[in-house]
Amino acid sequence: MLPQTPLFVQEIRGVPVCFKAECLQPIGAFKIRGAWHRLTALDDPARERGVVAFSSGNHAQGVAWAARKLGIPAVIVMPADAPKVKRDATLATGAEIVSYDRMTESREKIAAHLA
């Protein structure tokens, strides 16, 4: 289960506006919600096969985090020029990273081959 994040209510021009603090998620972004939702829907054979995703940032971290929590192997196809902080954060969750050159290679083809 994802950690709960606070809901802040602020009145703007007389209208209550709600703000969800997704920056307080474990990866610091809302992308973790979609990854968690999708991975929890996998059946056991799919979980055993593992997941492949492509991203250079928050989606990669979301998939990697959810996969680790659920015990699912994860491979992330990430451009070689992705920010080091994003690569390190993704690796820290236990995911494998497959690098590619975004100018000469297709992430979709690489991911399809790995799947």
What are these regions (language model features)?
Residues 1-115:
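PLP-dependent amino-acid enzyme catalytic core
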